[in-house]
Amino acid sequence: VGSEMCIRDRCYPQGNKQLKQQATMLANYIKQATGLQLSTTTLAAQRNCIKLSSVLRHTNPEAYTIRVNSDMVFVDGASAAGCFYGVQTLRKALPTGVAQQVLIPATEVNDWPRFSYRGAHLDVARHFVTADSVRRFIDILALHNINRFHWHLTDDQGWRIEIKKYPLLTKIGARRAQTVIGHNSGQYDGTPYGGYYTQKDIKDIVRYAAERHITIIPEIDMPGHMQAALAAYPELGCTGGPYQVWQQWGVTDSVLCVGNDKTLHFIDDVLDEVVALFPSEYIHIGGDECPKTMWKRCPKCQARIAAEHLQADGRHTAEERLQSFLIRHAEQHLNQLGRQMIG
């Protein structure tokens, strides 16, 4: 393959206009690891260069090759994403510590992913993290070639995404008065807790992830795990409240009232704004851990069951079929918006 490549201050990460941003990222990675400041260029070079390209012929669009000799480092992807993953592998080969030069051993790497969907999940509803921390999380995902970020944005313990049509979701639903200590010990820390992301925050984070070839899949959990939303809009619950943003862990009986037409409008409105913020093909609607206790004694829910002819059988109760009714409603709305539901 040849001898090692010496990266020093006159070595340029080089990419065409499409890959210029990746060249800049690589220069930043090298600076972070070693303190060595490199300039980037879009001009072709024959030596003393880390050349990025995306012309590799391969059946897998995320494939890449790395070749290192004494004059050049070549990173070639089957697409811009493939080149990006090659950059991440090169990044992991960098030494750490202040250096005037970096030696990259002569080598050849041919790599491609086994799985096209490589995902990670972050729950910011129960434990909020700042927008900067989310970006740091995305950086870590990029380092490990993760290309899907499942973002759990709402739950009983907090609503974290700004919905302009329902401002109380963040004014009230984003903050709980206190948090239980341990696993429902009955003791509380007495400290208010919360936070949320503005729609501008969301757009910036979505763009930041896309630059790293990561698709964010947002999750709005329904019809259970909605007590934070009910604290803001109690009329959406079976009892009308009052509710509070939940201070415990586990599963609460406070769920959306499916017999209330306002609930269906609420779901449509929220999903409209979510779809406008996230270009992902998939939108996650949760659907898990929804107790049917309130529905069994809610006149509106029982009326909906009767009106929709949702009958129990040997496998499902009428209330379980009521949940399916709501999920189908959400799915049909997302399909009309050109998206696919998961959950």
Report each predicted region and the residues it spans.
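Gly/Pro-rich turn-and-neighbor structural signature
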Residues: 264, 268, 272, 276-343
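An active-site-proximal structural segment forming one wall of the substrate-binding cleft
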Residues: 144-149, 202-223, 254-286
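A conserved hydrophobic secondary-structure block that centers on an alpha-helix together
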Residues: 123-156
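Contiguous, structured surface segment used for ligand recognition
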Residues: 3, 8-117
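Active-site beta-loop-alpha junctions enriched in small/polar residues
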Residues: 125, 154-158, 221-225, 288-292
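Active-site mouth loops of central-metabolism enzymes
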Residues: 119-133, 255-262
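Aromatic- and acidic-residue-enriched carbohydrate-binding clefts of CAZyme catalytic domains
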Residues: 157-211, 226-265, 294-318, 324
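Conserved, mostly hydrophobic/aromatic
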Residues: 30, 79, 120, 141, ...
